[in-house]
Every structure is written in structure tokens, then in C-alpha cells.
Amino acid sequence: MSALRLIVGLGNPGPEHAQTRHNAGFRFVDALAERTGARWGLDSKLFGETAKADIAGHTVWLLKPATFMNLSGKSITAALRFWKIEPEQLLVAHDELDLAPGTARLKFDGGHGGQNGLRDTIRLLGHGKFHRLRVGIGHPGHKDRVVPWVLGRAGRDDDMAIGEAVDAAIDALPLALDGNFNEAMKRLHTPKK
């Protein structure tokens, strides 16, 4: 499998969305940029903010689409074309309702699972053959409560758990960058004792 060259965090732009559950993908790439000393800059031709990060001997592009979540694919596909990156070399970090806070999971391929940023990306690519980092935000219990849930802020305990999941995913990332996704998944998916 190809090594990763582009890591995208999904979220909604603007300070009013900064700490919402829906911005778990932004939270991941922001933490990654902070840990590696990468600096964000606006890139209008890619419809987002970009940074170049050096991680475990690999140079990787980071992207935060400045479009709203539902239009994330526009930014992602523009970046893939501009940097001549194959979808298989892409990792998209996003919030995941079906995982509890404190849980993060890597996966390759599949559908959008109702996540609108993934939906738009899959629509524009014509397939779902790319890597995902699913950051658990929990589910409110009923589908009618999903929109206010994802657009709301997590409580203190859930927020800390989401932060721990982000840190664990960053710790597993060097294995994925080496193209060793099975080992990265094993490290991330195995409960700590």
C-alpha cells in the first residue's frame, strides 16, 4: 500500500465552530501541526489552509478545507490534483458518531456513513478508496438530536477523551506513514492496559 502524502482534517471554518464535536478532524490536524511545528497558511487555489509537516522522516501535506463540511470534497480533490497525489495516499480525519469519545479507528475504503464531508469527497472522487481516521464523538441517542450534537461542544470528560484519542492517533501515525497500516491499526485499535 502507498505511503500517505496528504492528511486532511474535516470541520467547519470560523471561531463559532472551533470547539464543536464536528470539528474533530480539524482538531487532529491542528494537534499534528502543533506537535511537528508546521505552520498553517491560507491557499485559495486549494480552498483551505495548508501546512507542510515532517513526521518520522516523511514530508506530508496537511489540509483544513475552508469550505463548510458539506463541500469538503472540493478542497480535497483540488489538493490531490495540485500535488499529484493518488487517493490511496490520502488520510481524511473526521468525527464519528458511532464511536465513543476516546476512541479512534483507522480504516481504508467504504461509504460515508452519513458523514457529509466524506459524502462530498466520495461523490467527487467517484469512489471511497482512501484512508480515514474516525475520531469518536459519541451519539446523542436519537437521530433527531444528531445535528445539535455534532454542532455542539463536548462536555469536559468527553472533550478530554477526544483529545486522548487524537494523541493516540498521532502516536500511531508514523507506522501509517511508513505504509504499515496494519501495524498502525493494531496499535491504535488495541486497548491500553
Swiss-Prot record:
<keyword id="KW-0963">Cytoplasm</keyword>
<comment type="similarity">
    <text>Belongs to the PTH family.</text>
</comment>
<keyword id="KW-0378">Hydrolase</keyword>
<feature type="site" description="Discriminates between blocked and unblocked aminoacyl-tRNA">
    <location>
        <position position="12"/>
    </location>
</feature>
<comment type="function">
    <text>Catalyzes the release of premature peptidyl moieties from peptidyl-tRNA molecules trapped in stalled 50S ribosomal subunits, and thus maintains levels of free tRNAs and 50S ribosomes.</text>
</comment>
<feature type="binding site">
    <location>
        <position position="17"/>
    </location>
    <ligand>
        <name>tRNA</name>
    </ligand>
</feature>
<protein>
    <recommendedName>
        <fullName>Peptidyl-tRNA hydrolase</fullName>
        <ecNumber>3.1.1.29</ecNumber>
    </recommendedName>
</protein>
<dbReference type="GO" id="GO:0006515">
    <property type="term" value="P:protein quality control for misfolded or incompletely synthesized proteins"/>
</dbReference>
<dbReference type="GO" id="GO:0005737">
    <property type="term" value="C:cytoplasm"/>
</dbReference>
<dbReference type="GO" id="GO:0072344">
    <property type="term" value="P:rescue of stalled ribosome"/>
</dbReference>
<feature type="binding site">
    <location>
        <position position="70"/>
    </location>
    <ligand>
        <name>tRNA</name>
    </ligand>
</feature>
<keyword id="KW-0820">tRNA-binding</keyword>
<feature type="site" description="Stabilizes the basic form of H active site to accept a proton">
    <location>
        <position position="95"/>
    </location>
</feature>
<dbReference type="GO" id="GO:0004045">
    <property type="term" value="F:peptidyl-tRNA hydrolase activity"/>
</dbReference>
<comment type="function">
    <text>Hydrolyzes ribosome-free peptidyl-tRNAs (with 1 or more amino acids incorporated), which drop off the ribosome during protein synthesis, or as a result of ribosome stalling.</text>
</comment>
<dbReference type="InterPro" id="IPR036416">
    <property type="entry name" value="Pept_tRNA_hydro_sf"/>
</dbReference>
<keyword id="KW-0694">RNA-binding</keyword>
<dbReference type="InterPro" id="IPR001328">
    <property type="entry name" value="Pept_tRNA_hydro"/>
</dbReference>
<dbReference type="InterPro" id="IPR018171">
    <property type="entry name" value="Pept_tRNA_hydro_CS"/>
</dbReference>
<dbReference type="Pfam" id="PF01195">
    <property type="entry name" value="Pept_tRNA_hydro"/>
</dbReference>
<feature type="binding site">
    <location>
        <position position="68"/>
    </location>
    <ligand>
        <name>tRNA</name>
    </ligand>
</feature>
<dbReference type="GO" id="GO:0000049">
    <property type="term" value="F:tRNA binding"/>
</dbReference>
<feature type="active site" description="Proton acceptor">
    <location>
        <position position="22"/>
    </location>
</feature>
<feature type="binding site">
    <location>
        <position position="116"/>
    </location>
    <ligand>
        <name>tRNA</name>
    </ligand>
</feature>
<comment type="subunit">
    <text>Monomer.</text>
</comment>
